[in-house]
Design a protein with these regions (language model features):
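Generic structural detector for well-ordered beta-strands
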Residues: 1-5, 52, 78
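Short, intrinsically disordered, mixed-charge
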Residues: 13-20, 58, 108-112, 116-119
């Protein structure tokens, strides 16, 4: 869980726009389809992340599946809060990871990067 000092709309905006204000330093560019239900992130390390949104209930729920190389997974975020504070609860299920990869740590790093952009 993470908490941000801003409205859910702002958190939603950044989570669905990986290149907005260069907030995610690992993403070099992204292609977003017209409906916003499919994103292909081109990462600075040369890999791509293919994201398909299953559910976008703005601004309260995001649900997607993703593929990055041999790694596949599902991500769900539920945003709770009001105009000046948002609590974000996430679940992350990952397949295809090596023994030493820690998905929870990666998720925490992602949420911390988002916190730096949005404020505490």
């Amino acid at each position: 869980q993470a908490t941000y000092g801003c409205a859910p709309n702002k958190v939603w905006l950044y989570m669905t726009n990986p290149t907005l204000n260069s907030w995610n330093p690992t993403v070099a560019s992204a292609e977003v389809d017209l409906e916003g239900m499919h994103i292909v992130e081109k990462n600075k390390d040369g890999t791509t992340t293919d994201i398909h949104f299953d559910k976008l209930d703005k601004p309260r729920r995001i649900s997607c599946t993703f593929t990055r190389g041999k790694i596949r997974g599902a991500f769900t975020a539920i945003l709770l809060g009001s105009a000046d504070s948002t609590s974000l609860e996430c679940t992350l299920d990952v397949e295809g990871l090596g023994l030493f990869t820690k998905p929870q740590k990666k998720l925490e790093e992602y949420l911390e990067t988002l916190r730096k952009v949005l404020g505490d």
